[in-house]
Each structure stands twice: as C-alpha cells, then as structure tokens.
Amino acid sequence: MIQQESRLKVADNTGAKEILTIRVLGGSGRRYAGIGDVIVATVKDAIPGGNVKKGDVVKAVIVRTKKERRRADGSYIKFDENAAVILKNDGDPRGTRIFGPVGRELRDKKFMKIVSLAPEVL
C-alpha cells in the first residue's frame, strides 16, 4: 500500500535510485496504490549523468509492494521492497531495462512493455 510521502526504489535504468510519492492517480479521494497503479512522484536520489535528475516530477507505475495482495485464485503475493518504474507521458517505460521481478497484475493493467522487459513475472 503506497500513499503520499511513500518512498520507493526505482527498478529501471533511468538514473533515479529513489522516488517520493506526491499523488496516487485514479480518483480525487484515492489514498492507496498497489501493483499496477500509476503515481506522480519526485526524484529524491539519482546518479550523475542519468536520464532524470533530482527534483524532477515524474509519473511511475508500481511494480512491487511489501503489502501482500490477494489474487483471484486465492493466493497472495508480496515482495521484499516497494519499487516502481518511471513512465513517459504515453505510458511506456522511460528506461530500457527493468531490474528484479514484477507482479502479474501489470499484464492485466496493459503495461505489456514493462512485462516484456522484466526478467521475471510473478
């Protein structure tokens, strides 16, 4: 469960290392975001010479959460960290590589480019 002020690891090669959630998109009173939800965030930590720099406001999709999520078949999925992938305005990932596994929920939410770049889909 990601909400305002949540800090997430960045799971791509855009140059950002950590982002801070500004807003959860998808309704005026929406408080929490899970795997496959889009957020607006600011870059808090970045490497020099990267695609994004500290202070940039970006859109990102959540790919891993520590909070368990119940699936339709009754199973639960949770990860060791909260992580996101930075997006372009058209919804495609800004980076060219994805690090670590991503949730299967991304396939249902039509983030096929991220699913194809990911090394593992759980």
UniProtKB/Swiss-Prot annotation:
Alphabetic keyword roster: Ribonucleoprotein, Ribosomal protein, RNA-binding, rRNA-binding
SMART domains to which the protein is assigned, alphabetical: Ribosomal_L14
Subunit structure: Part of the 50S ribosomal subunit. Forms a cluster with proteins L3 and L19. In the 70S ribosome, L14 and L19 interact and together make contacts with the 16S rRNA in bridges B5 and B8.
Protein name: Large ribosomal subunit protein uL14
Family matches, as InterPro entries: Ribosomal_uL14, Ribosomal_uL14_bac-type, Ribosomal_uL14_CS, Ribosomal_uL14_sf
The UniProt record lists the keyword Cytoplasm: no
Keyword Acetylation appears in the UniProt entry: no
GO cellular component: a single term: cytosolic large ribosomal subunit
SUPFAM superfamilies according to UniProt: Ribosomal protein L14
Any one biological process term the GO annotation gives: translation
Organism of provenance: Arthrobacter sp. (strain FB24)
GO molecular function list: large ribosomal subunit rRNA binding; structural constituent of ribosome
Family under the similarity heading: Belongs to the universal ribosomal protein uL14 family.
NCBIfam families associated with the record: rplN_bact
Described purpose of this protein according to its UniProt entry: Binds to 23S rRNA. Forms part of two intersubunit bridges in the 70S ribosome.
Pfam families per UniProt: Ribosomal_L14
